[in-house]
Amino acid sequence: MVRINEHYIEISNSYLFAEIAERVNEYKQNNKNREVISLGIGDVTQAIAPAVVEAIHKATNEMACTKTLRGYAPYEGYDFLIQAILKNDFTDKGISIEADEIFVNDGAKSDTGNIGDILGQDNHIAITDPAYPVYVDTNRMAGRTIELLPCTPENYFVPNFPRKTADVIYLCYPNNPTGIALNAAQLKNWVDYALTNKSLILFDAAYEAYISQQDVPHSIYEISDAKKVAIEFRSFSKTAGFTGLRAGYTIVPKELIIQTSKGKMLSLNAMWRRRQSTKFNGTAYIVQRGAEAVYSIEGQKQIRKAIDYYRGNALTIKEGLESLGVTTYGGINAPYIWVKTPNNLTSWEFFDLLLNKIQVIGTPGDGFGQAGKGFFRFTAFGNKEDTLEAVLRMKKLLEFH
């Protein structure tokens, strides 16, 4: 008799954004003459940088020639991309990372979800609440115990330490969904906690390109001794518009040495390399050439232009809602604006109000966890015209609601 992984019973039947898509599609079917504007799922709208497109075209042409054809990529990524990452994201910023600590992937979601493969099932997991659903769901799928760390206006969305000592801690900063960032002192507190308690921090830095304030670290490795306690995840999705291309990378320092139940010391770097060689066949050559071009002089100028475009959208949403007396958070160091729902509406009531009355989509906060109840997330990834129109519609609605 076949047995299933019954931990799947403990998670929601549908992924948050799949549920939203289902509701929106149903609305569109019944209201085909209505123009719906999405400020919901964090998918990009601006074209891939020309430097990246040119590199992808060139790599595609290489694949058409027997002499330059590339097959399976190295499990950890091609050296040309690893060296570009190393120089631009770390060495030039004074951060010491070695090439064999970088693992190229097909997007941060894969590795944040799969990192649990090398971690024991009996680890006590601490996750901020609200949080990117993947952190919670993947650990529930594995049957691990989870302690949620509420992030609310009362603690300025900066979590307190767990009640029970955490073995593994998920931190995403700048944060999805709240848009809040940790300064260096706040992040150091967590590194010190991990050092004291022999914990592992899983640090999701997918939105570091949107940091605008000087005292906000772009990498956890800016904090002294963080390489002893932290794995960092990076993404090209929001930095360079790779949501449809799929590329990112993970840093697993060689200083991360964990003791087994029998007292043997094992390297997480070696374990992750072994895991990847078994379950991952590498990111496509064409995509990695595109990612390499992100670090070219022209590529950097072009992606910065797109990032500034999205930052402008964030400011439009934030200022527009605040002009109505709506309380907002984030939007300064991240492409997300976290909103207190007006008039004591629940998150889903506000979702339905916006969809049915003005055809604007956002994301209900309680889809990110219990602490998200009564909140709502807007993203800055729409195009400028749609963002302005959505804010105008919300102003007309909320002024009289």
From Swiss-Prot:
Q: Name one GO molecular function term.
A: L,L-diaminopimelate aminotransferase activity
Q: Which CDD domains match?
A: AAT_like
Which InterPro entries does UniProt cross-reference here?
A: Aminotransferase_I/II_large, DapL/ALD1, NHTrfase_class1_PyrdxlP-BS, PyrdxlP-dep_Trfase, PyrdxlP-dep_Trfase_major, PyrdxlP-dep_Trfase_small
| The keyword Transferase is assigned to this record | yes
Q: Per the UniProt entry, what are the Gene Ontology biological process annotations, in alphabetical order?
A: lysine biosynthetic process via diaminopimelate, diaminopimelate-aminotransferase pathway
Give the top-rank taxon of the lineage listed in the UniProt record for this protein.
Answer: Bacteria
Keywords from the named record: Aminotransferase, Pyridoxal phosphate, Transferase
Catalyses which reaction?
A: (2S,6S)-2,6-diaminopimelate + 2-oxoglutarate = (S)-2,3,4,5-tetrahydrodipicolinate + L-glutamate + H2O + H(+)
Which cofactors are named for this entry? pyridoxal 5'-phosphate
- Enzyme kind, highest EC tier: transferase
Subunit: Homodimer.
Query: HAMAP family from the xrefs?
Result: DapL_aminotrans_1
Could you identify this protein by its name? Answer: LL-diaminopimelate aminotransferase
Q: Which organism is it from?
A: Azobacteroides pseudotrichonymphae genomovar. CFP2
What is this protein's gene name?
A: dapL
